[in-house]
């Protein structure tokens, strides 16, 4: 079983990761051996683990326990195993010296924190003194640090590094400055004196800060009315129609009716008197003579037949 433990002390120090290659029975035997050695009482730090296997696994040199008379911080860790999951609050050590395992790590000049660690089948709590860590320069420690971690962050930047991971949660206070919004500045600048001022298609003044209750450092901008897009498009189209009615040449709709000349009407009436349904050859001939398109000639013949039909129906209705 591989057991990992990450200790983050409350003072500026390197974060330490313990890796133990023992099962639960071996750990209990090692703890009983530590109690029987006479260095400390059985009531002190019963959950501390043996360091011999960790030193061998990390490539460090095994050494004895180091006593410390200074105060130490408590690390409460959840204890888990491969078969069951236990929750341990961490037994409190009595006031006084508390031994801690010697862990090999890099020197102070190249000290690296271990924000991420490899968690095995077991996880146990213990308490350590501030000065109980012994420094030694081992190359294997750096190799295993890169193996059991994703990124390398300095110890003084560890809190800020962890804060970045929770910066986007509402309940986590952000230690960073608020970012400038993309919608802070209006798009339309001041116009000249002679230029007419028109409203923008997408006005930016409709965005207001969205205050978060649980405390983000920055501000988010959202529209007051989410259903405003349709209104904007309708107003824009209405503006275009208004400009068209003002006399603009770019006016949509039906083409302006151009009346036929007397020469064109004479030629069309002559052909209609001969045949009410014009043929293809006749249509091409009249088109060349009157400078009209074949489609115009076809439509004129259709309208002329309808006009005659209405006239005949009106005459019949007026007859006694």
From Swiss-Prot:
Species of provenance: Takifugu rubripes (Japanese pufferfish)
GO cellular component: nucleus
Family to which the UniProt record says this protein belongs: Belongs to the Abd-B homeobox family.
Pfam assignment, any one: Homeodomain
Its job: Sequence-specific transcription factor which is part of a developmental regulatory system that provides cells with specific positional identities on the anterior-posterior axis.
Taxonomic path: Eukaryota, Metazoa, Chordata, Craniata, Vertebrata
Main location class: nucleus
Listed GO MF terms: DNA binding; DNA-binding transcription factor activity, RNA polymerase II-specific
Subcellular location, record wording: Nucleus
DNA-binding interval(s): 253-312
Protein name: Homeobox protein Hox-B13a
Keywords per UniProt: Developmental protein, DNA-binding, Homeobox, Nucleus, Transcription, Transcription regulation
InterPro entries reported in the protein's UniProt record: AP_axis_regulatory_Homeobox, HD, Homeobox_CS, Homeodomain-like_sf, HoxA13_N
Keyword flag tRNA-binding: no
């Amino acid at each position: 079983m591989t057991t990992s433990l990450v200790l983050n002390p409350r003072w500026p120090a390197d974060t330490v990761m313990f890796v133990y290659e023992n099962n639960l029975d071996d750990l209990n035997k090692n703890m009983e051996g530590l109690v029987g050695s006479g260095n400390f009482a059985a009531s002190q730090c019963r959950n501390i683990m043996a360091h011999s296997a960790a030193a061998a696994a990390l490539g460090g040199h095994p050494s004895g326990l180091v006593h410390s008379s200074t105060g130490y911080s408590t690390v409460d860790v959840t204890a888990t195993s491969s078969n069951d999951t236990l929750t341990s609050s961490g037994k409190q050590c009595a006031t006084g010296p508390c031994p801690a395992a010697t862990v090999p790590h890099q020197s102070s000049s190249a000290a690296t924190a271990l924000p991420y660690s490899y968690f095995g089948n077991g996880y146990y709590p213990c308490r350590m003194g501030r000065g109980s860590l012994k420094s030694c320069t081992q190359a294997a420690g750096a190799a295993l640090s890169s193996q059991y971690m994703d990124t390398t962050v300095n110890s003084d930047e560890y809190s800020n590094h962890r804060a970045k991971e929770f910066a986007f949660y509402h309940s986590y206070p952000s230690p960073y400055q608020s970012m400038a919004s993309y919608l802070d500045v209006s798009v339309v600048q001041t116009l000249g004196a002679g230029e007419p001022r028109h409203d923008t298609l997408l006005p930016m003044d409709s965005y207001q800060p969205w205050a978060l209750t649980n405390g983000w450092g920055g501000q988010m901008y959202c529209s007051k009315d989410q259903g405003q897009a349709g209104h904007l498009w309708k107003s824009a189209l209405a503006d275009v129609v208004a400009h068209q009615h003002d006399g603009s040449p770019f006016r949509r709709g039906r083409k302006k009716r151009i009346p036929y000349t007397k020469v064109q009407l004479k030629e069309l009436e002559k052909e209609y008197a001969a045949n009410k349904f014009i043929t293809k050859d006749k249509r091409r001939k009249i088109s060349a003579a009157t400078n009209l398109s074949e489609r115009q000639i076809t439509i004129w013949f259709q309208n002329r037949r309808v006009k005659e039909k209405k006239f005949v129906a009106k005459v019949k209705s007026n007859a006694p």
